[in-house]
């Protein structure tokens, strides 16, 4: 097992040197130097220095053979593989591509301890070629955080970022899309869960999820988006715009209800594929997105296509024919632009089954209201099958397989037809038999956050935990399902130290200090709210989740109050740590189950166990270190029927 975030293969000697201000950096790309110097505590001045760091594109036979002999590996040939050779005369990074050199810079950062690096040889190579995140566009206020998040993904050596556009980017040819998008999102944000009421309970037809969090209900200028794309590409990310089409495209019809498949729907989400005007609008949108992103591939959505053959133009047509013809039209248009096509793959699947809902994906589906409530709902119609389209669309359409949790064999329906797949909506900590699936041909995986792009939501949706856990799957060739507990604990540690790098520069004490740099409260609660994903218009409400306050009091009567928020900076004492295994799953049932409330607070806190209870270490940077700290008090809100248990308070100096 690899210990810590370091290259998997690393031979160290007893001696070493320091990366200091005297160390020169010889790099073919400014981003390599910038990346090295951007991380805190990679340099330590006043010590025996490495004379230089050299980045070299290409691997000499001598260096390649040294890797083979040192680690019993084949000769390095992966373009993302990188070698870090550390010697008295300098640090030498070798790779076959510029992206590989970039990951070499990341490996140096991972290996350095207070600027020190022992002599030796390190080698790292990914397990899979596609390692990504799917996100919404940020709002303007979150653009800086977006870049910080990209830097975090780079630290964990991700190489793909899929960004859903929808109505959240300026359209110069169709400003009505943006104008109506703002109104629509404001309407949907009236209260948490309004979108779910509209989607599941309001209409006698099936509706798509409403992505009103995209851009935080606003839109970015094309120049702003270009800036974000450039930032990603400088760090060697492939940026894939996601342009929902056919279904999930409410943004197109907000200003153009005349192209809706269901004209009477006040919130239409599916255009009529028999109406030429649908493609005139869609292709205008694609043209502007292609100009801004300059992409190699576009994800055109096509997931959860529900409103099938319902308008007068489409009635009588086979669902599979409609679905395939729409994909082919868009595929042909993108091919003329030298852009590849990707889709979500659920509507190509014949045998997907959702527990308590019945057939799903591309099967013929009996529809109920409330939506998918087979046991309690009222039958309202039949959704035509689309799975036969798998025989009609071009084989180089790239497939995002996101129904992996319903049945491990579902992917075979796509692979056996000759398509390439990568897993979507990926949750590595729940994914079984990773190595076996890669051998079958998967290109990798993409984790999804279907909500606002900010730190709190990403944490509470377990995105941070998921991306750090999946790092072990993406870069550790010895990854095994049986190592879950070890990787879980390492992941919790990774995130905590990544989020609080300054703590490593201070000494921790359980004795109260007058002028601490940080105060760390180890606590937990018996408060309980069932875990939920904050997606599709469901957002955390403070009146539900705030259960108390941390009060810092100083001798001059100054006070500082920090809210205690369940699921954000505190968790329950009874949280479950183990992953349970369903040895005989029924169709659609997952093999693994976990308690997400352990991971929901990872990043801002470090969960730990003590006497069969769980506590959460939550650091607070002292807002007034120059003042004398008198008291640290943990208070419970009077209207909350719960207790907050304090295990210990630590001080850093």
Model-flagged regions — what are they?
Residues 149, 391, 406-506:
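Flexible, acidic glycine-rich loops studded with aromatic residues
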Residues 3, 8, 77-335, 342:
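Feature activates predominantly on carbohydrate-active enzymes
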Residues 136-138, 166-168, 244-248, 303-305, ...:
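Active-site beta-loop-alpha junctions enriched in small/polar residues
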Residues 174-215, 355-387, 594-599:
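Charged, glycine/proline-rich intrinsically disordered loops and linkers
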Residues 269-419:
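Active-site neighborhood of glycoside hydrolase catalytic domains
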Residues 1-124, 343-352, 358-388, 395, ...:
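Acidic, contiguous N-terminal accessory segments
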Residues 506-516, 526-529, 535-541, 546-548, ...:
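Beta-sandwich interaction modules
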């Amino acid at each position: 097992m690899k210990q810590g975030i370091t290259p998997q293969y690393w031979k160290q000697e007893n001696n070493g040197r320091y990366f200091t201000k005297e160390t020169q950096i010889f790099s073919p790309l400014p981003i390599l130097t910038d990346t090295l110097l951007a991380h805190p505590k990679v340099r330590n001045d006043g010590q025996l220095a490495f004379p230089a760091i050299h980045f070299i594109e290409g691997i000499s036979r001598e260096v390649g053979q040294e890797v083979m002999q040192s680690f019993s590996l084949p000769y390095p040939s992966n373009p993302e593989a990188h070698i870090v050779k550390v010697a008295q005369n300098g640090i030498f990074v070798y790779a076959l591509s510029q992206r590989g050199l970039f990951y070499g810079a990341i490996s140096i950062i991972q290996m350095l301890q207070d600027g020190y690096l022992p002599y030796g040889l390190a080698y790292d190579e990914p397990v899979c070629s596609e390692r990504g995140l799917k996100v919404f566009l940020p709002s303007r206020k979150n653009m800086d955080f977006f870049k910080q998040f990209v830097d975090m993904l780079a630290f964990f050596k991700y190489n793909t970022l899929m960004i859903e556009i929808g109505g959240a980017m300026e359209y110069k040819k169709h400003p009505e899309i943006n104008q109506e998008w703002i109104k629509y999102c404001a309407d949907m944000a009236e209260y948490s869960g309004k979108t779910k009421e509209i989607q599941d309970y309001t209409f006698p037809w099936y509706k798509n999820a409403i992505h009103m969090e995209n851009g935080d209900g606003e839109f970015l200028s094309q120049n702003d988006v270009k800036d974000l794309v450039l930032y990603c590409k400088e760090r060697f990310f492939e940026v894939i715009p996601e342009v929902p089409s056919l279904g999930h495209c409410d943004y197109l019809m907000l200003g153009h209800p005349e192209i809706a498949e269901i004209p009477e729907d006040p919130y239409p989400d599916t255009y009529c594929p028999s109406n030429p005007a649908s493609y005139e609008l869609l292709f205008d949108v694609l043209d502007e997105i292609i100009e801004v992103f300059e992409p190699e591939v576009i994800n055109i959505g096509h997931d959860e296509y529900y409103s099938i053959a319902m308008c007068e133009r489409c009635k009588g047509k086979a669902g599979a024919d409609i679905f395939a013809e729409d994909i082919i039209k868009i595929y042909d248009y993108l091919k003329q632009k030298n852009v590849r096509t990707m889709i979500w793959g659920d509507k190509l699947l014949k045998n997907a089954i959702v527990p308590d809902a019945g057939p799903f994906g591309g099967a013929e589906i009996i529809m109920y209201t409330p939506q998918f409530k087979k046991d309690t709902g009222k039958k309202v119609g039949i959704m035509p099958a689309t799975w036969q389209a798998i025989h009609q669309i071009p084989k180089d359409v790239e497939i995002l397989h996101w129904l992996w949790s319903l049945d491990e064999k579902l992917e075979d329906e796509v692979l056996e037809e000759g398509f390439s797949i990568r897993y979507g909506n990926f949750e590595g900590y729940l994914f079984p038999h990773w190595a076996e699936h890669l051998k079958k041909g998967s290109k990798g995986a993409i984790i999804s956050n279907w909500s606002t792009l900010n730190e709190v939501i990403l944490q509470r949706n377990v995105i941070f935990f998921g991306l750090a856990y999946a790092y072990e799957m993406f870069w550790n060739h010895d990854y095994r399902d049986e190592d879950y507990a070890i990787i879980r604990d390492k992941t919790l540690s990774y995130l905590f130290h990544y989020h609080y790098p300054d703590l490593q520069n201070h000494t921790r004490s359980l004795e109260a200090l007058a002028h601490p740099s940080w105060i760390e409260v180890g606590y937990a609660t018996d408060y309980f709210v069932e875990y939920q994903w904050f997606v599709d218009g469901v957002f955390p409400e403070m009146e539900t989740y705030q259960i108390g306050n941390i009060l810092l009091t100083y001798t001059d009567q100054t006070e500082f109050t920090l809210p205690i928020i369940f699921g954000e900076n505190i968790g329950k004492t009874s949280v479950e740590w183990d992953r349970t295994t369903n040895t005989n799953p029924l169709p659609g049932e997952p093999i693994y189950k976990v308690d997400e409330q352990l991971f929901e607070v990872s990043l801002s806190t470090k969960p730990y166990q003590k006497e069969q209870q769980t506590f959460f270490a939550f650091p607070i940077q002292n807002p007034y270190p120059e003042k004398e700290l008198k008291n640290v008090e943990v208070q419970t809100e009077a209207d909350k029927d719960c207790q907050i248990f304090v295990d210990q308070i630590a001080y850093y100096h």
